[in-house]
Each structure stands twice: as structure tokens, then as C-alpha cells.
């Protein structure tokens, strides 16, 4: 038997009412988060209310990475300034917005030296981005109007924190609430 000591804290209320959830929850795949770094260290825990998507082949849920654009970028830009605390890493593919109407390309560098924002640099431009838009993880490099999400499964959100130091961590999953 293992004993784990943990400080208790209260998350701000994020789920007021559960209308539909995934019965039995789901297993969160942590392999996609290996290259997500915070203060130079790998992430050891996901907070609640994280978007995950189901891989129909394996049945595992993968985190759908996003980042809020913090400064407008021109149509020919390859560097995008985004808010801190995103989960992107070098090698991930991104597109602008969840409508998947833009192009997608590979992240070649992430500059985290500024205290206010991170700068994500891509191999080629994915188009103009307005402040407040969201960079969304994509499957691979695509031209405009051809970007795809990494998996074709249902999008849900986690209902509790997920310990990433443990393989095959379970989580309650909210479909509608």
C-alpha cells in the first residue's frame, strides 16, 4: 500500500451542472505532453477543465493543446506571440482557430524568455492572427482550409486534476454541462 500526502486546495468552480459525461471516465495519454515545459521542468499535473479528444483506434484520450494569441500577427508572419501557460512544444503542429479554415504548420522554436508572453515560431506562415484568437493543435502540415485535429474523436473536458507522473491516469470526462 502507498500513502501519498497532498495539500488540499479548492479549485474555482468550473462545472456548475453535469448534463452528460463519459460513463466510467477515460484514460489520459501523457505521451503528448513530454515536450511541454514550465519553468524548464516537465509538467507533472493537469488541472481540471482541460480539453481532450478520444483516439478512436486506441480508446485513449489526448490533450488538445491550445494557446491564446496575445498580439496580432500579419498574414506573412511565422512568429506568433501567445499567452503563457500553454502546452505546446517544439515539433507540434498548429492552426489558427477551431474552425480549421486556415493552414497548419510545425513549431520550430518557442521563446519563453519574456515574462508577459511566449513567442511560437513556425516553419512557414499559417496566416494572420488577431489578438484573442486561439492557436489550436493540428494533425500535420496542411494548406489553407485543409487543417485537421490530431484525432477524429469526440471532444470532452476533464472534470478533475490528472496526475501525469502516473501512467494510464483515469479522469472523469464531461461531454455537456
Where are these regions (language model features)?
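Surface-exposed, low-hydrophobicity beta-strand/loop segments enriched in small/polar/acidic residues
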Residues: 1-177
